[in-house]
Amino acid sequence: MSFNTFGHLFRVTTFGESHGVAIGCVVDGCPPLIPLTEADIQGDLDRRRPGQSRFTTQRQEADQVKILSGVMVHPETGVQVTTGTPIALLIENTDQRSKDYSDIQNKFRPGHADFTYEAKYGIRDYRGGGRSSARETASRVAAGAIARKVIAGMTVRGALVQIGPHKIDRDKWDWDEIGNNPFFCPDKDKAAFYADYLDGIRKSGSSIGAVVEIVAEGVPAGLGAPIYAKLDGDLAAALMSINAVKGVEIGDGFASAELTGEQNADEMRTGNHGPAFLSNHAGGILGGISTGQPVVARFAVKPTSSILTPRKTVDRTGHDTEILTKGRHDPCVGIRAVPVGEAMVACVLADHLLRHRGQVGG
C-alpha cells in the first residue's frame, strides 16, 4: 500500500492498523531547535482520545505517545528541542477486541472500505478496519501537535457546527464553550440539545453525520501558490483524506453559488496595516494564496456504517447475505473529527509556511 505520506517540506508518514500492536507517524522536515516534549503532543491526543463520553466509542485507549527520535536536550539550555532529523512517534494499541469482528471477516460491511480494499489488494484487515479505521487519525493528531509548533503565532481551532440536520446558532458562537461539552460545540444551548439527540441515536443502535468547521487565525498573507499548489487545494485534499469525510468547502463554499457578485466579493478599504477586508466570504484565500484573513474550512462527516441494524450485503464468495456489526463504535464520528481536522490544517499550514520561506524568504 502506497500513499501513506502527505506534505512537501513538512512531511508526515503514518503507519499501523486499528488492531495492530501500535500506530504512529514519522514527521520529516521539522526545523531544528523547536522545544518539543511528549507532553506537548499528549494534550492534543487527549482531546481526540476515545471513551471519554457516552457519545463516542467506548474503546479505552490511553494514547500515550512516545518520541523515538528527532529530539535531544540542548547542551546549553537544558531544554529538549528538535534536531531537524525525522521525528518518530509511537502510540501503542492496548484495547483491541478482534473477536468482535470474527463474524464479518468474510462479509463486506456496507458503507465501509471493506469491498474496495479487497477489490484493490485482494485482502483486507477486517479487524476494526485496519488502515481505514479512524484509529489511524491519532497519528495525524500527534503530527499536528508538532505542526502547531512550526506555525507559532497562528491559531488553529475547530468546532462541531452541525449534527444531522441540526445546526448551531452562529450568533451564540463562543470559543470558550468548546471545552465545556463533549461535542466541541461553541453553542451552549445546542450542546445540550445534541446530548439528548445523540442519546436517542445511540440507544437505537444507529449513527448520524456531522459538519466540522476549522478556523485558522494569524495566517499571514502570501501562503500558497497559484494553480497546482493552492493553499485551499491542499487543505481540501488534507481534510478529504480524513476517514468518513465526504465533502469540503472553503469560506462560504457551496453557499457562494447562491450569491451575486456584489454579495460575494470581499470589499477592501485602507487599514492601519495595509488593506482591510470588509467581509470574508473567501475564507481567507484568494487565487490559492492566503489573504491574511482567518482561513475557514468546513467538512462533512458521514454517519458511520457500523450500526446495529441488519443490512443487506454480499460475502467474499459473491453470495447475498445480511450483516450485523458488533464492536464499539462512535454514534457520531464527527465529534472526534474536530481535533483531527485541526491537526490536518496545522500540518498544511506548516508545510506551506516552509515552502513560502524556501521560495521567497522571510
From Swiss-Prot:
What cellular-component terms does GO give this entry?
cytosol
According to UniProt, the reaction catalysed is: 5-O-(1-carboxyvinyl)-3-phosphoshikimate = chorismate + phosphate
Q: Which GO terms describe its molecular function?
A: chorismate synthase activity; FMN binding
> Which Pfam families does this entry report, sorted A to Z?
Chorismate_synt (PF01264)
The organism's superkingdom is given as Bacteria
Cross-referenced SUPFAM superfamilies: Chorismate synthase, AroC
Cofactor binding remark: Reduced FMN (FMNH(2)).
Q: Which cofactors?
A: FMNH2
InterPro entries, per the entry = Chorismate_synth, Chorismate_synth_AroC_sf, Chorismate_synthase_CS
The UniProt entry, under CDD domains, shows:
Chorismate_synthase (cd07304)
- Family note: Belongs to the chorismate synthase family.
Question: What is the protein name given in its UniProt record?
Answer: Chorismate synthase
According to its UniProt entry, this protein's organism is Rhodopseudomonas palustris (strain ATCC BAA-98 / CGA009)
Query: Which lineage?
Result: Bacteria, Pseudomonadati, Pseudomonadota, Alphaproteobacteria, Hyphomicrobiales
Q: Which gene encodes it?
A: aroC
